[in-house]
A protein has these predicted regions:
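Active-site-proximal helix-loop-helix substrate-binding element of RNase H-like nuclease domains
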Residues: 61-62, 66-83, 158, 163-223
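Short, glycine/acidic-enriched loop or turn micro-motifs at the edges of active sites
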Residues: 15-19, 172, 227
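Substrate-recognition/cap helix-loop segment adjacent to the acidic, metal-dependent catalytic center
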Residues: 119-165
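Conserved non-catalytic scaffold segment of RNase H-like nuclease domains
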Residues: 2-125
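Acidic, Mg2+-coordinating catalytic module of metal-dependent nucleases/exonucleases
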Residues: 110-117, 122-123, 183-258
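Hydrophobic/aromatic-lined pockets within catalytic cores
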Residues: 128-132, 178, 233-240
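Conserved protein kinase catalytic core
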Residues: 20-22, 175, 230
């Protein structure tokens, strides 16, 4: 692998998670529990993917009680078959993090991104504290309401990335670019019950690949991170100054043009 230091490198990560309670109970919690069992990421430039990694987190994946609570627990036999066929490795979380840190250092990654990046940052922090309780010093930030909440960005930068990467949310970026294009709204427009334009990764990927709605996400970490990388690469080709790269409820940034 040859690294061109003149280029920007991005790590695009996706997680599949479970919890210590059922999905129905978890969604009622003030803060949803997110324990990572499937972690996948790419490292890419604006034109190519140079690294693909996929691991199952040993401490979570091999805990049957936790896996029974996974939203996509019906996929457990599929994962078991992937492990048996050497398509994915089961590793301790600390080892996965070390591999990721080495990849970040060796490629000179500057940006960390995901589609709804806040979810994945929180999942990484929660998983760290679940597997290794009372080890990490927590960071807190003041919210707009004046209360304090865990600072997932500082946590991940300090302990998991070992580098102050710029955080980018592909959902936020897609809403200001691809989802605000006339062709997207003319041919791929779908709305929620509240009348908001749908802007999930599946719809956006169908649009950029002209798949007419025939593509459905696998909801496995590496597969999803690859399509999210393709979305990022398309966004990077658009010459537009973005208002922000990480916003709360980013669908509100979509400009209706049709």
């Amino acid at each position: 692998m040859k690294i061109d230091k003149r280029k920007n490198y991005y790590i695009i990560l996706d997680t599949e998670t479970t919890a210590s309670c059922t999905p129905e109970e978890n969604i009622e919690r003030k803060i949803m529990e997110k324990l990572v069992y499937d972690l996948g990421y790419t490292i890419a430039t604006k034109s190519e993917i140079v690294i693909k990694r996929n691991y199952l987190v040993k401490e979570i994946y091999e805990n049957n009680d936790l896996m029974n609570n996974a939203y996509f627990n019906s996929k457990k036999p599929m994962y078991d078959e992937m492990v048996e066929n050497n398509q994915v490795e089961v590793k301790p979380f600390a080892e996965i993090v070390k591999i990721m840190q080495n990849d970040i250092a060796e490629t000179g990654v500057k940006f960390f991104g995901a589609y709804n990046v806040g979810f994945d940052l929180d999942a990484l922090m929660q998983t760290s504290n679940f597997i290794y309780p009372n080890i990490f010093k927590m960071f807190f930030k003041k919210t707009k309401s004046g209360k304090f909440a865990p600072d997932t960005i500082k946590f991940c930068q300090a302990y998991l990335f070992r580098k102050e990467l710029e955080i980018i949310d592909l959902w936020t970026m897609a809403c200001q670019t691809l989802c605000s294009q006339k062709t997207f709204q003319a041919f791929y427009l779908q709305e929620t019950a509240r009348g908001n334009i749908k802007s999930n990764a599946e719809i956006v990927y169908n649009y950029i690949e002209d798949l007419e709605g025939n593509f459905a996400e696998d909801h496995t970490a590496l597969s999803d991170s690859i399509i999210e990388t393709r979305i990022l690469q398309r966004i990077l080709r658009i010459r537009k100054t973005l208002e922000t790269k990480f916003a709360f409820l980013p669908y509100r940034l979509i400009e209706r043009v049709v």
